[in-house]
């Protein structure tokens, strides 16, 4: 027993013992879809090789990293915990033609999480044969006559990848799409409009693309309210705010079932959500076996990094009070929900 878990990393998906560090990496699932005779499928051979390489890479990171304190170096190398996760899950579902909030979506989530977990375990056991088990192995739950011999005390964690997914140009973590066309707020008050590339391609191929449509969506119009878009496309490109909180929890639970540490996931609530609504989701998360959960109520912050409705001038009491305190005047608060924000803890 190395002690009690005392904290998590900032987004809560990695439980940490005193002086442990957080060593995470994420596989872009949108790159794991192949096509045969016009039929998309998950390329599990490619995914298997990617998992094996990623586990080795993360173990190498522990070895070459220069930690700020000797205590961190000691604890990190004692357990050698890594956290391999995913991003681009929503993009994968879109390529497969499967809406996010469906039973088939949950089946795919469990299937992928299970596969990655098994492949990560195999890769860590191979590393143990090559480099040895983690030093604290004899004090661990794996120290049994027939127990697995791992190089890393834990192998999988699902992070939100809010910034990483921007670099990789894919959907964040296991989140659904936040919006199809939206304004992204960056440094020094600048902003720019982004359009989901899969939606843009389908819109052009199906003949309903227009700059005006992209502008309307960026200004907050919901896809379900656009008449010229076919119903099956509306269903496929469901966004975070169109998915019920219960479905958000179900999807997180599907991944948590096969994840060593925790899963970071935002449950988006409408602005009018009540404390009872939130309590219901907390209880559902507990019943589903989640290790933590994050909720976000629409427009409960003054400014978000991504907003599907930049012109929404809804009265925002918290922002108004802050502005009055600073000598500013009343104020509106545009915005939408988390979309890649933090998630469940340990």
What are the roles of these predicted feature ranges?
Residues 50-73, 77, 98-161, 234, ...:
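Internal maturation/activation junctions in enzymes
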Residues 31-48, 57, 76-117, 191, ...:
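N-terminal leader/propeptide and maturation segments of large enzyme subunits in energy/redox metabolism
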Residues 1, 71-82, 106-111, 134-149, ...:
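A glycine-rich phosphate-binding loop feature that marks nucleotide/adenosyl-phosphate handling sites
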């Amino acid at each position: 027993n190395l002690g009690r878990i005392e904290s998590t990393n900032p987004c809560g998906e990695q439980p940490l013992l005193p002086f442990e560090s957080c060593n995470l990496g994420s596989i872009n699932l949108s790159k794991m879809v192949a096509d045969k005779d016009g039929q998309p499928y998950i390329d599990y051979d490619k995914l298997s090789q990617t998992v094996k390489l990623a586990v080795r890479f993360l173990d190498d990171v522990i070895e070459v990293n220069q930690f700020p304190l000797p205590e961190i170096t000691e604890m990190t190398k004692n357990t050698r915990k890594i956290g391999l996760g995913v991003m681009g899950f929503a993009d994968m579902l879109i390529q497969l033609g499967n809406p996010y909030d469906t039973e088939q979506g949950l089946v795919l989530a469990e299937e992928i999480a299970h596969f990655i977990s098994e492949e990560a375990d195999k890769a860590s056991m191979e590393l143990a044969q090559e480099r040895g088990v983690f030093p604290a192995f004899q004090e661990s739950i794996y120290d049994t006559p027939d127990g697995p011999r791992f190089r890393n005390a834990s192998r999988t964690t699902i992070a939100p990848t809010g910034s990483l997914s921007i670099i990789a140009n894919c959907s964040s973590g296991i989140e659904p799409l936040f919006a199809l066309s939206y304004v992204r707020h960056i440094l020094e008050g600048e902003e720019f409009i982004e359009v989901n590339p899969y939606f843009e391609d389908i819109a052009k191929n199906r003949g309903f693309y227009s700059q005006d449509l992209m502008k309307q969506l960026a200004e907050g119009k919901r896809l379900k309210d656009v008449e010229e878009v076919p119903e099956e496309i509306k269903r496929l490109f469901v966004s975070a705010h169109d998915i019920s909180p219960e479905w958000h929890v179900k999807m997180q639970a599907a991944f948590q079932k096969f994840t060593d540490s925790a899963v970071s996931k935002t449950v988006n609530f409408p602005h009018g959500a009540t404390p009872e609504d939130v309590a219901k989701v907390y209880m559902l998360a507990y019943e589903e076996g989640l290790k933590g959960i994050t909720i976000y109520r629409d427009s409960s912050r003054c400014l978000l990094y991504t907003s599907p409705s930049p012109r929404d001038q809804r009265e925002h009491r918290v922002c108004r009070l802050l502005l009055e305190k600073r000598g500013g005047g009343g104020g509106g608060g545009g915005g939408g929900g988390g979309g890649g924000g933090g998630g469940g803890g340990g």
